[in-house]
Amino acid sequence: MEQTIIKKKADRIRDVIKYIRRFKNATVIIHLDDSIIDSPLFKSHIQDICLIHEAGLKVIIVPGAKKRIDEILTSEKMDWSYHNGIRITSQDAIPLIKMAAFDVSNKIMTALAGENKTAVIGNWVRARSKGVIDGIDYQSSGEIDKLQDDSIRTVLDNGFIPIFPCIGW
C-alpha cells in the first residue's frame, strides 16, 4: 500500500518536471483578483507564483482591483456604473482609481518581497479612451493601445516579476 502511494507521488513529480522543462523560459501571465488579498489562501498563491518563477518561467502579474476601487469610490461618495462589464469612469474618479490600483499592486509586491522575490510595478501600458460605442460614452475608461515590449522584456530578463496595475497611461 505504501509503495503504491510513493510511486504515485514519484510519478506526479516526474510529470511536473516534464512541464518545467517544456515551459522553462516561457512567459506566463497571471491575473490575481484583488479579493484574494484578504483570503487566507493569498500567501499560498504568492508562494505558488514564486515556485513558478523559481522553476524558470517568466512571470507577469496583472492584478484586478475592482473590489478596492469600489471601496474607495464608495468611501468618497462617487457614483459609477457599468455597461457590458466595463466600469464607466469619470475623469474625477481617475486619481482614486489609480490609488486603488497601486494599493493592490503594492500589496502583491510586498507579499512577493516576503518570499524574497523582487517585483516591479510599472506603467508599460499605453491606453486610449474607448470613446462612445453604441451611444454609450465610456468617458475615461479605456483599452490597451500599446505595450512597451522592450522594457517588459528587460525587466523579465533581469529576473524581476513585473506587476501591471489595472490602469493605462
Question: In which residue ranges do the predicted regions lie?
Answer:
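Nucleotide/pyrophosphate-binding catalytic subdomain
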Residues: M1-W169
